[in-house]
Amino acid sequence: MALRFVDWDCYFEEPKSDVFVFDALYAPQYIEEGLLYPLGKTIPESSVYPAWTLEQASSQGIYYGIPQMVCMDTLFYRKEDPAVARVQTMQQLYEAIGPRKTQALLPGRDEGVIADFSLNNEMKYYNILQDHTGKVVPVQAMGNVQEDAMQYLKELYAMTGTATGRYDDGNEFTRAEWFAQGHGRALYAYPEAMSAIVRLGQGDDTDVKAISSCEHPDVATAYVDYVSISSRIPADKVEAAKKLTALLTSKPYMLAALKPASKEGVPQYLLAARQDVMQELAASDPNYQKLYRHLYRAKSWHVMAGTKDFAAWEAKVGPDIERDLKK
């Protein structure tokens, strides 16, 4: 049976392909709408996955997805900066760094946080709501935009600068490169930003941590990608689809995908959901060890989860968030 790969983005449309990878944020919606094929009461090698990665993978005892990758907001900072090293919340970060001193695209070494808003402002606001309410799914707060929660998104933009925050050249590593080249006091991005930092020779001088998005303790939510099968799959393709799903989440496949192609190569520094894969990556590379210890194992994580009508809520609050940011 021949494989055909199709570009698809779960943030813009619902799944149509036989086997697909998607953000578990939409798992409740996909399961509710009957879009996912039931995988059964067990999944291959379930013991290698931390329990939290499976939080949204099943419903009523039936699995609909297998975890593949995890990702979380990450604060990168220089070892020479003890004030930032002590930070545990976004409020403390703002108190330590404050708003930008200049509005140039590239901040000086002694100012600002270079923040990556590559998902969207709605997602960052949702993350703030989680920490602000202390709930993984803050249903009661998911109405109109709350000014007290918005204040933290405004402070993050103040530390970043509007031009820097809105900048988009299509290169996901541009901000990490700026930080590695000496701009900004900190970088607020995703774990894979470590790849550009190491490539530019700054890995040994850079530390990482996860912090709360507001003044309250971190609820610690992480993005998890699940591999699933479409409920529309023809009956004669089900077994082949199950084999592909198992392959895409297997240890050999994950290690082959995440390790550099050569000894001289720089790892991608993406985080696997499987603990056995992360342990091997951490043992093979000191900067993967940082990500494993200070991110993957550092907190009692929860899967970033939404409601069954999450996409509709995003569309509703998006324009209001943009208006508030311009005030």
Predicted regions and their residues:
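Conserved N-terminal structural module of periplasmic/extracytoplasmic solute-binding proteins
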Residues: M1-Y26, D236, L255-A256, P319-K327
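Short helices/loops that flank or line small-molecule/ion binding pockets
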Residues: D7-F20, P28, E33, D81-P82, ...
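Hinge/lid segment of periplasmic solute-binding proteins
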Residues: F22-T74, A85, K209-I211
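A ligand-binding cleft/hinge motif common to bilobed small-molecule-binding domains
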Residues: L25-I31, Y188-D205
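Extracytoplasmic/periplasmic solute-binding protein
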Residues: Y64-Q68, D73, Q91-M142, G184
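Glycine-centered hinge/linker elements that transmit conformational signals in sensory
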Residues: G134-N171
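Extracytoplasmic/periplasmic substrate-recognition and gating elements
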Residues: L200-E264
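C-terminal capping/gating helix-and-loop segments adjacent to ligand/active sites or protein-protein/ligand interfaces
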Residues: T221, L255-K327
